[in-house]
Amino acid sequence: MLTKKPVLSPDRCFSPEPVQRRLAHQFFDSISALPLVCPHGHVDPALLANPAARFGSPTELFIIPDHYILRMLYSRGVPLEALGIPTRDAPTETDHRKIWQLFAEHFYLFQGTPSGLWLKDELTNVFGVDEALNSRNAGRIYDYLEGLLALPKFSPRALFKRFNIEVLCTTDAASDNLENQRSLHEEGFTQIRPTFRPDAVVNLDAPGWRENLTKLESSIGREISSYATFVQALEERRAFFKKMGATATDQGAATPYTTSLSDQEAEAIFARALIGKLNPGDVEQFTGHIFMEMARMSVEDGLVMQMHCGVMRNHNPALFERFGSDKGADIPLNIEWTRNLHPLLSSYGNNQRFRLIIFGMDESTYSREMAPLAGHYPTILLGPPWWFHDSVNGMERYFNQVMETAGIYNTAGFNDDTRAFVSIPARHNVWRRVACNWLAGLVTRGLVDEEEGYDMARALAYDLAKSAYKLD
Amino acid sequence: MLTKKPVLSPDRCFSPEPVQRRLAHQFFDSISALPLVCPHGHVDPALLANPAARFGSPTELFIIPDHYILRMLYSRGVPLEALGIPTRDAPTETDHRKIWQLFAEHFYLFQGTPSGLWLKDELTNVFGVDEALNSRNAGRIYDYLEGLLALPKFSPRALFKRFNIEVLCTTDAASDNLENQRSLHEEGFTQIRPTFRPDAVVNLDAPGWRENLTKLESSIGREISSYATFVQALEERRAFFKKMGATATDQGAATPYTTSLSDQEAEAIFARALIGKLNPGDVEQFTGHIFMEMARMSVEDGLVMQMHCGVMRNHNPALFERFGSDKGADIPLNIEWTRNLHPLLSSYGNNQRFRLIIFGMDESTYSREMAPLAGHYPTILLGPPWWFHDSVNGMERYFNQVMETAGIYNTAGFNDDTRAFVSIPARHNVWRRVACNWLAGLVTRGLVDEEEGYDMARALAYDLAKSAYKLD
Amino acid sequence: MLTKKPVLSPDRCFSPEPVQRRLAHQFFDSISALPLVCPHGHVDPALLANPAARFGSPTELFIIPDHYILRMLYSRGVPLEALGIPTRDAPTETDHRKIWQLFAEHFYLFQGTPSGLWLKDELTNVFGVDEALNSRNAGRIYDYLEGLLALPKFSPRALFKRFNIEVLCTTDAASDNLENQRSLHEEGFTQIRPTFRPDAVVNLDAPGWRENLTKLESSIGREISSYATFVQALEERRAFFKKMGATATDQGAATPYTTSLSDQEAEAIFARALIGKLNPGDVEQFTGHIFMEMARMSVEDGLVMQMHCGVMRNHNPALFERFGSDKGADIPLNIEWTRNLHPLLSSYGNNQRFRLIIFGMDESTYSREMAPLAGHYPTILLGPPWWFHDSVNGMERYFNQVMETAGIYNTAGFNDDTRAFVSIPARHNVWRRVACNWLAGLVTRGLVDEEEGYDMARALAYDLAKSAYKLD
């Protein structure tokens, strides 16, 4: 496979201005060989725990599990059934080569999007495809990829080594037995660590909450019939996760509202949840209270606390009923941090044992609330641009709106936050390039010295993520 | 009239970086001759229906009807009376040459604004004025323009042909008899189409609501004494508009709140409106319900639905009382789409017969709500940057904040949304230039191939608007 | 002290694109010698009133009073005690050379921040330090600065002359006797003017409200036992401030909510405040009403009204209890202008005797609300980017989001809003550079003529601030 012009420009993400571009290359060259630190993501640990695991067909690797791909195709009229997504009650396409062809015919939809950039990078740098995917070469490329994916050197484990990943944190339910991590550790893969994510039991409106609680009961080996027992369960599970290598927790909620309920109030809400008779406001009050409790536990056990806020999950009820969650139908919400975090920060904001990393998709809060909070409280770090904003422009907005107030050292560097294992190097590549180009812009504008630029590039590419998540 | 340096730079809107600028020119050259598609605007069809129509004096063309011009002059202390705006009760300036002189003396206020750019383009490219307007040459330029405007080749019809407008959609009240469109169609001008805009009757707080309803009654030839009849009236009028060539409807509201009222609730509110005794919240509830009804009708008759949300009309009560609406005193509001559109999208968001184009002036919702919604729902397209944001920076923000998530193919291309007929080419010119410069930036940054750039330029300049409004 | 490369780039804040950069230099050269107009700030007039006043140690000058510096160091774990901040009850570091060393060791935190840029400028241009501060040279630089600061030519008065400040407005409590200004005026320093800031008495939840009221009583020489007397007191004090050279007032509040209470309502709230029994909402209602009253008084006495809105003061209660206000723990809030200012603008928005300058830190309101309001009402001007946004990117966002709608002539130019006297030239330098670079961008993009660029540069650097505050 040969073409004249590379599919993937060596200058990608860099300013066309020659002096800035040259400097961006220099910064990038100085950090591009650093290992990848992946402190927050959603890779299935089973992929790595089982040496015989394979990615399946190109369609199983690139299309079916990727909600960014699904949503864009769906938005232009491609039914999810035609993409092989399992439905509750109807047949779905099973010919993966045909799905791939359909995808290739619509690949133009991803022009200028991060998904398009990642995919080009993966095809080029992971699989050696050196032509742009289109409807004519789709079948040929499919066959080529299918051949490679069957080879041991394209197994998840082999790629894990090739990707130079120094540490990879997974995200795991509070009730998870972490068997995959255990077996990986026994094999020496201690750099794969769990993260404690209790959303399924602490958000009282989570789908299947009662079943999730039952799983939590199983994990601690006793019944959870009161709020007090529930909190004990969380504490026990955190201790277990920590023993299994976790350094952090994570929680998602529609809003970063925090509040401190009395024990009686918390017990009353929990009791109503158990009998399935929640009052209006119970969900928000309980989640807001658990944020406080999780902060308290972080002070006690030293796990870094993460908050991901501001998404309305499953916005499309018909799609959710038919195909379930994570099909690209989650839509961000506007949020407010200054007032909502006030109770939590009043209690724990100055505590040297506490660390909180916050993520949101309301970019209007970057310069107004997030950077000022991180630029004052010793306990707060800012997570990188999240989800829809994990893109060239999204990162540039983040740098330009956050860094003047918070400085880079109040951020947590980068994390890829992905379940698409093969996209990890591509995502870090974009971050590192955009960061280096931003720094080159600061230097060419006389705002930062060249020497400082090299230090900052390394911090953004590597050091900050490690130290933020206590991985050093 | 000769000057050395052109008033209008051939490089306008393009980056000074030479490589990007060259490519922007190439993209622009490839699309600049494409016809103009104008699927949403406010040109008075009478201007075109009457072959003898003229624009009047330069002041009547450029100043008196342009609320962008009026608001800026008013904001710096120029009374609207001095600009010839009719008042309810007092004399107003009638010497148009004097008004033009006053305008020229204040023309520096428009430095760096879109109004300034449009006006320079119109003077140069429509009228051949090749010097910058100022207080010294104002009278001379006035006389020159006055001479031209009397000529048949500067009649609205002549300019319509010269402007290479492929289709022009007007905006018309629900009760409009569309006589102008009818006579235009009979003359062969079938490319001039109406748009169904029922704001005056569906927004129960619209000025003169009762009179507007009376007109609607006349248009259907019977009394509207109930909500049920009202809905029938809307359906009948939509059918009439569709027969007269309409492909779309439009609605404006302070908020995109949608809700489904029961028939009894809707009847009760409508009954209160008829007797002029609305309860608090009635207006918002009724408009929110009508949004749902308009979506249902769109599913049935195939008209594209448009929503323009987030403006407080007539913010300045003293000005409104004296001079009426549309004098530059409408101020945008913050809005929310994710929760507000949820009811409507839950009902119609996946319906293949439905199409919804949304517009807002709360740019914080571009990346947070609008692009994610359009990047998921097959029914949603994003309208171009609207009103105050129909500008070089406004468009760049739109491209940078929308396209990574929604891609360009979930947008409706450009529309000029103007009542200033003569400004139409200038407005499309700015859009096409900014789009080409943005694409050149993507190519020089290695994010899009040059070949893709040409395709995207054509789509943004022409194809997307046609297909979004079902004009192809 | 000699190094090869200057610490402060002569190209700082300018685009690396050569044509734009050259033009930016030309614009900057044309305005850099203009005097500084400082119509809003917080310099202590005692510094200037007393010819023998000195700045103290380098630590007293640069660190202890600067809440930008304090918050960043605190955010990375440096205790305020170690920085010499007085606490209510515990010892604090008193060795200023040691504090300076600690600061230098953490100076990398300010990379790319406005504080870092200002400090480099001050060290270079005010004190002639020509090397970058670091942990190794910290002691040497401290000694050097300490030596200079003892010299008469580095007294506040000497620097005032050297800085070429044409006018400097201070900010003073309503009860202030303005003795410093009086003595300055007697010495001929009439360019130092007070500003009337009644927050401490009109915001009923201001710390020490009762004591503040007592001071106000003293200043007018009689008791304030009713709302009516309170309003009279404000009027009397405004008259006194005006006599002492004030041309403006200023008010800060969490929100720009305005409302008109009846006399009875206002009296009732004031009576509750006097007995310390406020109802929920009283504070916001009263402040909102006083905004209206202050506007009325501005119409009567011609003082320019300023509103600074959208900050939650003292967000960190533990820090506040220990160290008091203004230690970097104020966090911005989202705000709304369109609805909140509606009552005030309905009453005074068209009044030729009224002028209102508004400031906020919610940048999402720049293009959505602030620019449209200023681009319509003849009474509104926009203040420059404030507080956290007084930075290179903050200014660029302001220019790009405000100017297309409001034009530059509806803004109030620049003010430094600082209590750090020595940083004044550095802050104006950043504004002037960013403005010139922005204008050079407009010219090189063909949006503004070069000649217009020179006019606009002068307006932004000098004229607008003078005329906005009636200082011409």
From Swiss-Prot, chains A, B, C:
Keywords linked to the UniProt accession: Isomerase
GO molecular function: glucuronate isomerase activity
One Pfam family from the record: UxaC
Pathway terms, separated by semicolons: Carbohydrate metabolism; pentose and glucuronate interconversion
Regions annotated as coiled coil: none
Catalytic activity annotation: D-glucuronate = D-fructuronate; aldehydo-D-galacturonate = keto-D-tagaturonate
EC number(s) stated in the UniProt entry for this protein: 5.3.1.12
Gene Ontology BP term (one): D-glucuronate catabolic process
InterPro entries in alphabetical order: Metal_Hydrolase (IPR032466), Uronate_isomerase (IPR003766)
Similarity comment: Belongs to the metallo-dependent hydrolases superfamily. Uronate isomerase family.
Full protein name: Uronate isomerase
Gene: uxaC
